[in-house]
């Protein structure tokens, strides 16, 4: 009897496998760290062979650990770090170069050159995206232009490109399927989110041969089956979505205007805008949330590049804390930051500013500043950056947010969640499974594709809020705090 959905969750720092039951509860999980490669300052890569090896190993480990027969797996879901991209040889399955990470800034010059030529407008109109090194297209172009023989082989039709989901599907099916879903395709800067097709003009702008492109399908859809040699049985791959999009679905943000914010290395806020895309005028991006039941759902998104990375920085580089728990303890030991603000723009600024040249800034230091003030300012920076995104989102959508669902590694910090509610002046809701929400969304997509869950109403039965936070400060105090943050941003830009 098929009792579980198995999810492959390939993230920026680890590869993970999770088993979910029909109630959306986690039966078990297994994970392995993935090691980023930093060839030069501002560059970031992954070894794609190691990515696949780590993802496959945690899958077999999990099944063995809980003594789960593959016969009990109804479907496999995939969720992945978005924009990170690689190119491989279709004939051998061997990558021609490492996967270039979404955080990598090596293509700043390519982006600037294309912007100078005036391509930013048409790219925004067709893809909903800002012409920035963050997205996949400039990374693919870089590989074709800089890896010896790559462009020639691509023009001969011998190379394929894909985001992490495509790479996993290729390996799970032993090269039988080269596919992606709408949500991941919409992050490449090559996919027209209105026609739902790869766009010829965009391919021409970035000089990428059409033969490299994966087939695109809905997020909930049987993409194919795993090769029987892997698990001893063919298992349907029923769900695929980028991690932030999957998180929105896992939060059951099915209604127009529903929003979530994920607190990880970066912060990613998405708002469901229904079946029509909203063209942002406030520095956000328009993206495809998911494809389901013959329809496409769109979203507004604010992507903050460096959020929790600021906390990692004070832990790993400055050695101020030993753990996330330490950070919260220090923050609560003082009443405020004593007017210290910190902007962690280590890799430029994302939404809503989109300034790749911005650098990190600390303002307000005095002789009375303590370590505790600085640590608190770093934590508060996550909430302030999310404030900037949410205000832009409200202006674009015309919707004033009453509550915000949260998830991700740093959402366990209750001080941060309370401060977020204070600054936004809205309810913050922390659901169950906050560390596996993206995985849960992928499980829902995979389960819906094979009838494990009948429909979205069936899924809503699994909903549950673990903790709520409500604003505890007045408008006057909120205004003073936000004005200080705005001054810090001015110094950054």
Curated annotation (Swiss-Prot):
Protein's pathway: Polyol metabolism; glycerol degradation via glycerol kinase pathway; sn-glycerol 3-phosphate from glycerol: step 1/1
Regions crossing the membrane: none
Signal peptide: none
Enzyme Commission number(s): 2.7.1.30
Keywords (A to Z) from UniProt: ATP-binding, Glycerol metabolism, Kinase, Nucleotide-binding, Transferase
Binding-site positions, glycerol: 82-83, 134, 243-244
Gene Ontology BP, a term: glycerol catabolic process
Pfam families xref list: FGGY_C, FGGY_N
Catalytic activity entry: glycerol + ATP = sn-glycerol 3-phosphate + ADP + H(+)
Amino-acid positions noted as binding ATP in the UniProt annotation, renumbered to this chain: 12-13, 265, 308, 312
Summary of activators and inhibitors of this protein: Activated by phosphorylation and inhibited by fructose 1,6-bisphosphate (FBP).
Binding site for ADP: 12, 16, 265, 308, 413
InterPro entries listed in its UniProt record: ATPase_NBD, Carb_kinase_FGGY, Carb_kinase_FGGY_CS, FGGY_C, FGGY_N, Glycerol_kin
Disulfide-linked positions: none
A GO cellular component entry from the record: cytosol
Top-level taxon of the source organism: Bacteria
Gene Ontology molecular functions: ATP binding; glycerol kinase activity
Gene3D superfamilies found in the cross-reference section: 3.30.420.40
Residues bound to sn-glycerol 3-phosphate: 12, 82-83, 134, 243
Subunit-structure text: Homotetramer and homodimer (in equilibrium).
Family: Belongs to the FGGY kinase family.
Function: Key enzyme in the regulation of glycerol uptake and metabolism. Catalyzes the phosphorylation of glycerol to yield sn-glycerol 3-phosphate.
Name of the protein this chain belongs to: Glycerol kinase 2
Species annotation: Clostridium tetani (strain Massachusetts / E88)
